[in-house]
A protein has these predicted regions:
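Phosphate-coordinating catalytic segments in nucleotide- and nucleic-acid-processing enzymes
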Residues: 1-264, 269-271, 344-375
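Walker B catalytic acidic pair
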Residues: 277-279
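Walker B motif beta-strand of ABC-family P-loop ATPases
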Residues: 273-275
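C-terminal lobe/lid and adjacent interdomain/linker elements of RecA-like ASCE P-loop ATPase modules
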Residues: 4, 10, 289-375
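Short alpha-helix boundary/capping motifs
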Residues: 207, 288-289
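Short N-terminal micro-motifs specific to bacterial/archaeal maturation
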Residues: 240, 247, 282, 306-307
Length: 375
């Protein structure tokens, strides 16, 4: 929700200003428990809030009396000025800055096309709603009609994210003021940040749809992921006395462990958007078939929106076959990416997958030609 994010940004700015002011002459207890409340109050009243009203609120909340205070009138007035400037900044400006932070972190400040200096844009179309973000020199120049999306996107591209754990991952960042981080830190937060929910749901597993998925997953992931002392993530199989630390699992098993954890702790919900970047890379061919079937089952049971990228004709065919088996082939769209004249294009090839298979088969044909070249 863009409005909520903008409000969070403004409230955080107000909180920092109030924190600095309060810290001049109040205890840390006040700063910790009351400043955030005042910031929220000011943000709610921003439209009708005048300088006089703001002065009245701060004087009352901080019990500020110029003659009896150790803080000068100039410092108080400076705080009032800063708060008024913060409240006068438009939602559009905050939206722009928020978008900039997210894109800069995800793409490491390299957003625009490196081959040309033209204005670039990213467009998102959801049914009849269209949103565009324009970029010049890697800086957001305009946000056109931002869309509120209430389901968080989950991007899985690296099973080794499990090795980072909560200490080296997101928990080291949650205390940073106004921190924005990339998709792998976000994934760490979803894995390690919902431990209480995981333990609760794991005990009841009342959803028949989830049981279907877990039963199918047992063919590869024969154990269960759990947290020791709400901190360390371990993996336990029934026939093994001592549980494994997740860092010691095979790369393929880590892929299934991540999926199992996200399902059981409620991070993935009905209608979630899941982005899978070449999930077959670390999987044995037999497990590739299983993972493809799980993806199709998840879409059917939970109505997930799944964006899948693969370079494997084997894995692609598995998706195609299982989609037909489970009756969701009419929901699948297929696209082929290709380069032409130093530009990248994406072409819709639904109903004509031969184009994809032909392209993916070219390297094998090269080997075949080399093998029989001297015959």
């Amino acid at each position: 929700d863009v409005k909520d994010k903008v409000d969070e940004e403004r409230i955080e700015s107000l909180r920092r200003t109030l924190h600095d002011f309060a810290n001049e002459f109040y205890s840390w207890g006040f700063v910790k428990y009351d400043v955030k409340r005042i910031a929220i109050q000011l943000n709610k009243a921003k439209v009708e809030l005048t300088r006089e009203k703001l002065t009245e609120i701060l004087s009352r909340e901080f019990n500020y009396k110029p003659k009896n205070s150790g803080i000068t009138q100039s410092v108080f007035n400076s705080t009032i000025d800063k708060i008024m400037r913060t409240l006068e900044i438009t939602d559009e400006y905050y939206t722009k800055k928020l978008t900039q932070k997210i894109f800069s972190e995800e793409f490491k400040q390299q957003i625009n096309n490196t081959l040309e200096k033209e204005t670039g844009y990213v467009q998102l179309t959801i049914k009849k709603y269209v949103s565009k973000v324009y970029f010049d020199n890697d800086i957001v120049s305009k946000v056109f009609k931002s869309i509120d999306i209430f389901n968080k996107a989950i991007y899985l591209d690296d099973p080794f994210v499990l090795d980072r754990g909560p200490v080296n991952g997101v928990f080291s960042k949650v205390f940073e003021r106004n921190a924005y981080y990339g998709h792998q830190d976000n994934l760490c937060e979803l894995i390690y940040g919902n431990q209480e929910d995981y333990n609760l749901v794991d005990k009841i597993v009342a959803d028949e749809r989830l049981e279907k998925i877990m039963n199918k997953m047992q063919f590869a992931c024969k154990g269960k992921v759990f947290f020791k002392d709400n901190r360390e993530m371990l993996y336990k199989q029934d026939n093994v006395l001592i549980p494994f630390k997740v860092a010691n699992l095979s790369t393929g098993l880590k892929t299934f462990a991540i999926l199992q954890t996200l399902l059981l702790n409620g991070a993935i919900k009905d209608g979630s958007l899941i982005i899978l970047d070449e999930p077959e890379i670390h999987l044995h061919p037999e497990w590739q078939l299983l993972f493809a079937e799980l993806i199709v089952m998840l879409q059917k049971e939970f109505n997930f929106h799944i964006l899948l990228n693969t370079h494997s004709p084997y894995f692609l065919q598995a998706i195609e076959v299982f989609a037909e088996k489970y009756g969701i082939d009419d929901k699948c769209e297929y696209y082929l990416s290709y380069n032409e004249h130093e530009e990248s294009f994406v072409k819709r090839v639904t109903g004509n997958l031969e184009e994809i298979y032909a392209k993916l088969a070219k390297p094998l044909q090269v080997l075949e030609n080399l093998r029989y070249a001297d015959e």
